[in-house]
Amino acid sequence: MNESNSQDLTRVSPFYIKEGFSVYEFTEKLFEAYVIERINRFLVKVTLDGEEILVHLHDPGRLKELIYPGNLVLIRETKGNKTKFSITAAYANSRFIVLDSRLHNIIASKFIPKIYEKEVKVGNSRIDFKYDNTYLEVKGCTLVENEIAYFPDAPTERGRKHLKELRELMRKGFNAILLILVMRNDAKCFLPNEKTDPKFSVEFWDSIKEGLKVYIKTFSLIGNKIVYVGDIPLCKTNLT
């Protein structure tokens, strides 16, 4: 996938998404806290102004390079959880990386036509969006190593299933898109994480061979806004 192809998705939007455009703004105050320990997939103990509290983490990934004792995080008050606060972002490589996966589809909706269906049932799965003759699945990415963004950071049977469903849809004549949101701006290209989930990697490359379009968009947290930085390509390998 070359740079010109990576811009196609913005061109089908009801408006052109320029680099530097704010795709989400937090209305809640963001507080600095420090990680003490991760209790389980969705619960983290932090210290806020010297007080130990439990906060919600809405990201099932391993996040070992982001959620570890002593690391700086941003938290905000949220509703609908057992805890008062949720982790919004974690600090790494001189920047904050947004971790809340509830925001992914909100952000993705900025890049597609205004008329669309959400959570469309396909086989035994649900695909995030459908518009016109196109099905679009969204994946959030937070792992970057040596300027390469990787997904997933933990084995994902659900992710593999989504790719299989997209391939079946393409065989029926539909268009299929995988939109990857890299929630940081220090990556130059993207690869599926073969080391962590080799089965997902195989499905990823096989799906591309069958016509799946992949778009990778990067973002930055600036103040209380998530800002679109730009697109990055797939890294060059013997499979691209």
Curated annotation (Swiss-Prot):
Annotated InterPro entries: SfsA, SfsA_C, SfsA_N
Molecular-function GO terms, alphabetical: DNA binding
Similarity section: Belongs to the SfsA family.
HAMAP family (UniProt xref): SfsA
PANTHER family linked to this entry: SUGAR FERMENTATION STIMULATION PROTEIN A
Name this protein carries in UniProt: Sugar fermentation stimulation protein homolog
